[in-house]
Design a protein with these regions (language model features):
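Helical "substrate-binding/catalytic lid" subdomain
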Residues: 1-120
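Hydrophobic alpha-helical segments
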Residues: 120-130
Length: 130
């Protein structure tokens, strides 16, 4: 049960970080974005805690990035053992690994937004070279 719940948590928080990054990159008011999420069907205790952390770039640890990455690896190993595909988990695991490479191991797992930002910078550099 714990692995299934953590699969959802890890994937959801990576997606939430990406959504905040997308909203910010598109010039949206992030407080309006937070309000839209928290006043609709997507609202949860988790969004009410993590969106303000993302907006404020508060990476004080509640759940460490290193623990999130370890969790994704344990889940992936079990999924492979039982023959279950986990494409969302695999993508979020890659992002948490990239976040670790940015020295975010003891930062909150929402610091994964920095890995997403790094991908944006890399994509921009490739586009600029063309």
């Amino acid at each position: 049960m714990k692995l299934a719940v953590n699969l959802y948590l890890n994937s959801m928080l990576a997606a939430l970080a990406e959504a905040v990054h997308f909203a910010d990159g598109g010039g949206l008011d992030l407080e309006a974005f937070r309000h839209a999420i928290d006043s609709g069907q997507l609202a949860s205790d988790l969004t009410r805690v993590k969106i303000p952390k993302l907006i404020g770039r508060d990476f004080a640890v509640q759940a460490a990035t290193s623990d999130a990455y370890t969790s994704t690896r344990l889940i992936a190993d079990e999924a492979r053992a039982v023959g279950v595909a986990t494409p969302m988990l695999d993508l979020s695991s890659e992002l948490y690994r990239e976040s670790l490479a940015l020295a975010n191991d003891r930062e909150d797992m929402v610091a994964v937004i920095e890995a997403i930002e790094a991908r944006t910078r890399s994509a921009s550099e490739v586009t600029a070279v063309r």
